[in-house]
Amino acid sequence: MAENNARSPRLLVTLTALFAALCGLYLLIGGVWLVAIGGSWYYPIAGLVMLVVAGLLWRSKRAALWLYAALLLATMIWGVWEVGFDFWALTPRSDILVFFGIWLILPFVWHRLVVPSSGAVAALVVALLISGGILTWAGFNDPQEINGTLRADATPAATSSSIADEDWPAYGRNQEGQRYSPLKQITADNVHQLKEAWVFRTGDLKQPNDPGEITNEVTPIKVGDTLYLCTAHQRLFALDAASGKEKWHFDPQLKTDSSFQHVTCRGVSYHEAKADTASPEVIADCPRRIILPVNDGRLFAVNAETGKLCETFANKGVLNLQTNMPDTTPGLYEPTSPPIITDKTIVIAGSVTDNFSTRETSGVIRGFDVNSGKLMWAFDPGAKDPNAIPADEHAFTFNSPNSWAPAAYDAKLDLVYLPMGVTTPDIWGGNRTPEQERYASSILALNATTGKLAWSYQTVHHDLWDMDLLAQPTLADITVDGTTVPVIYAPAKTGNIFVLDRRNGELVVPAPEKPVPQGAAKGDYVAKTQPFSDLTFRPKKDLSGADMWGATMFDQLVCRVMFHQLRYEGIFTPPSEQGTLVFPGNLGMFEWGGISVDPDRQVAIANPMALPFVSKLIPRGPGNPMEPPKDAKGTGTEAGIQPQYGVPFGVTLNPFLSPFGLPCKQPAWGYISALDLKTNEIVWKKRIGTPRDSMPFPMPVPVPFNMGMPMLGGPISTAGNVLFIAATADNYLRAYNMSNGEKLWQGRLPAGGQATPMTYEVNGKQYVVVSAGGHGSFGTKMGDYIVAYALPDDAK
């Protein structure tokens, strides 16, 4: 018995020393590797110290606590020197060390260190208190936040559209893409009382043949007393706006397969026929119609009252968008965003499969008669004559740059503004023609009636990073030097917001050309300069090893090693066989959610992201042929291995993640922010989102850690001084004070909310509605919910 009692204390000391030794060996070996490739000396030094601590513990010497206290304090000093008082950046540098330090001061542990050393326990306690104090201070003083207050003054802006205040009749409420509502029943003072008003379930869930990239991104529209929305499979629903009850639904019978790169519908468009532009037959058949784009290349016109097809439109209500396409394989051309509707024209473009081959279908933009569906014009960005209409023997151009995001429209100028993508394959461009380069990654302004080019502005030259313009542009009239200027705001993946006079494409906010890294892959080249807007959320400095992150110092070390193994010289570092760190990453700092602009206050709300990706070019060889095998289809995703058939390299595209699946760049990965559009200053910026729904295990209670999470979807703003946003990787709809960014309310969603909300009023009550259906590749919970919130009847 005495022998067993003696073994027990010794076993505890042995296990403690063994843990310290394993930590030390890991840090020493990994740290030497890191230093050899140009990284920090901290890790091998910390590893050596931990090995000495382990030796002292093995010998039961309390001097180990002195040395460990010194290591802990040195680590905190080093951490603050590297990243400042940033809680989330300090956490992986300190968490294991702090927990192990707490273990060492437990009485049943240090009492077993029988060789005394004066003050050792007290020294470690002091070191832990100092470390805890630093972390506590950092937790309440976020260096990434900007804490200002927007101006409250407002001047009613002129409007070119006659939209009833209570309606939301287009994707961005108006076709200017402002995502702003003049409603103010819900205010910053009462939004905390918001309650769930109704929930509608569409019944549209992931099917066995669907790709991983099935997403629920719809923003419903509301006209009169009816909501109109589409589901992931483009089923169209009309709901009573007050109760959420179904009025009718229409199913286009979309047949998908796993090669589709997208299965999604961001919204539908509305048109009311007018006697001066529509025949009596059209008005009798479909006086009010919903225009529904479908991922297999069809466009439907549906009677807004009955849900029946409009017989006088195209082929009994169905328009074939695959006509004259160079490749009509379903899924290669996918209209995923609602078209622009003018009094005369439907203007529609579509998504083209990224990174598949050099023989993909065209990204042509077309204008169709809104009443008959007849082709009025075409603009093929990759053709020598973009406006040439194909004959029966002639098709549109292979691999023309496409425009997949929602467009914007100025009715006064009759100009439609299209955010353009890059010619695919995206990550190698040595074979692109001048025509394919001409309008790629540009803002394109076309006459909506004729399709003729008004102007274009290119935001990335010879794009090798898939830095397409992916957000709906926003139109507003802004005061510049005392003069009102009609401008267009074009948020870009790079974090730049390009601001141009929408009449002529001239820059309103400077965007000087600056040199960028050189050295393209074999057979390619890199543009010598790129435009950098003065209005930007671009990172203020390039990433370094200090910006690497992890759950612990161990996976943080792995991320630092991976970082130094990649090619990275800042933004626009060219793709490489070595592997290139792409930051801002492929999701972009801005994505399809766009920004919200209050035209009266002349302020904007934005939700930028900061998530690096890694691209790696794969030379042709066994298993990586130049030409596609027979019957080859798309991969069904934009990430992972992409074949890029027809060019010298395939490519892999992935988020830059740690071994635990966490981003290797330290948080925040997502922000909510406000801009003063008169001064072009960022007034406030806050982290948004918690890891609650990204944890490796279910969390029964909310996780109060506001890390700043990745997101997909945009904000809306209201005259009630409230902004609403879902979008984040946790399942919440949130409300913020527009003036200062204070979070006022959040509502738990039943599934992922990767969609932009909307708001409207019916029967005297204001509602806020969001789609909660999840996002396949984003990894959020899938569902089929449309959720509405409103104030209770007795709210004050």
Model-derived segments and spans:
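Extracytoplasmic/lumenal domain signature
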Residues: H192-L205, L236-S258, H271-D276, I283, ...
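Short, solvent-exposed loop/turn elements at domain surfaces
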Residues: Q175-S181, D204-D210, F237, D426-I427, ...
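Hydrophobic or amphipathic alpha-helical targeting/insertion segments
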Residues: F99-V114, G119-P143, L239-E246, T264-H271, ...
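Topology signature of small-to-medium multi-pass alpha-helical membrane proteins
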Residues: M1-T149
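Repeat-blade elements of multi-bladed beta-propeller folds
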Residues: W168-G172, E213-H233, F260-R298, G331-T358, ...
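Segments forming glycine/polar-rich beta-alpha architectures that bind adenosine-containing cofactors
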Residues: R502, P574-P575, T580-P612, L617-P619
